[in-house]
Amino acid sequence: MICTKMKAACLLLLGAYTILITGCSTDQRIAKKVGKEFKNSQAIKQYQVGFALYNMDDKKMIYQKDADKYFTPASNTKLYTFYASLKMLPERMPALKYIEKNDSLIFWGTGDPAFLQFAVKDQSAYNFLLSSNKKLFFAPGRYSGTFFGDGWAWDDYDYYYQPEISEMPIMDNMVTSTYVNPNKINIVPKVFAPCFSVDSTKTTGNFQVTRDFLTNKFHHPAVAVKPGYNQQNPYKTSPQTTIEVLGDTLHKPVGLIDLKIPANAKTLYGAKRDSVLKHMMLPSDNFIAEHLLLVCSNQLGDTLSTTKAIQYINKHYLSFLPDKVKWVDGSGLSRQNLFTPRDMVYLLDSIYKQVNDPVKLFDMMPAGGKSGTLKNAYPKTDNPFVYGKTGSLGGVHNQSGFVLTKKGKTYIYSFMNNGFVKPTAEVRAEMVRVITYIHDNF
């Protein structure tokens, strides 16, 4: 009997040892082959590249190339904002803080990006204010930052991807102009229509709207509008602009009041958090990303501060990262952000565990060949094998996410490229080649 038990125990140990050795040898084989792909790539030798590949089953790195070096992440930063939002925000986003006092409804912004946002289309705050029979007053002053994040390119103030940051954003903080006929455009919000004027000195070229840097004066050339024309320009934010846009949208007057938010202020909840996160991730929406950090800050106290939110998140939720991050904004527009590829991998692993539902998580992320910013990066398919986040600035192009292999494995990867002068398409193609190789072979 004793011999039989000893024999069984030995067989179990031998089996476990065999599995361990097999697992190690498999990872070593993958590391060797992936390393060879990097070594033999002439393209990758021309710029700074960091890469990390992580085995989720064994909870260990398979292959690293300068994975402990710092890179400008661009919109890979949104993965940090995504994780922070999962940790700090309730399932329904705080849309407004308010009190009712005598004949007045006084409200404060929470930074909520969903107020009539063109993709989320949440109307919770709108309907709440519209249905009130009290006088409406907006109380500004919660936001402690500037209208642009640290390290942003101010030259980009007039581009759709860089709306201003404010405590109560409305309609993406942008003006949308669209084609009506060759001589007319439709302007939303309509309150900005009187701010548009024709620049009679420009009589050639395409119809394009521009805005003055410090004011809400919009100009367009004296040329015909072409069918299909659709443009978004950020508007210049201010408390006065906020109440004018609100009043025009609600078709009722909204006043300003100087009042600090009291402890007994109530919270109105609005859009579903996960819906907002998906609308941030798929198109890489900078506006949503920045304001999500303000909503996180709203959970901490009276002041809306990107810096305060990031400091809190770093202290309470990111201590597991192997490298200290330099994180300054929610979107990645700033070149001051610096993350390592291995940090990106461990963050994605924590996101995976936090959501605890791969189908749900992957639905919120761009999918290679199918959706979001990865739709055109990989061949068109209904069965994507890559789910992740891209990040691009001049000389910067990154991908971090999950790769599903033909052998049924799911690996986490981060592929960061900085300091290149060649076309971004060539850098992207090399990333796609390597990630596809991993999918096909492992």
Residue ranges with predicted function:
Residues 59, 78-82, 168, 246, ...:
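Residue-level preference for non-acidic, small/hydrophobic
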Residues 71-85:
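Active/ligand-binding-proximal structured segments within catalytic/core domains
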Residues 87-323, 441:
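Conserved serine DD-peptidase/penicillin-binding transpeptidase domain
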Residues 2-11:
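Bacterial N-terminal signal peptides that target proteins for export
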Residues 62-64, 293-442:
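Small-residue-rich helix-loop
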Residues 21-23:
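C-terminal motif of bacterial Sec signal peptides marking the signal peptidase cleavage site
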Residues 25-70, 89-92, 130-134:
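Beta-lactamase-like hydrolase cores
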Residues 32, 36, 80-83, 166, ...:
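Solvent-exposed, polar/charged alpha-helical surfaces in well-ordered, non-transmembrane soluble domains
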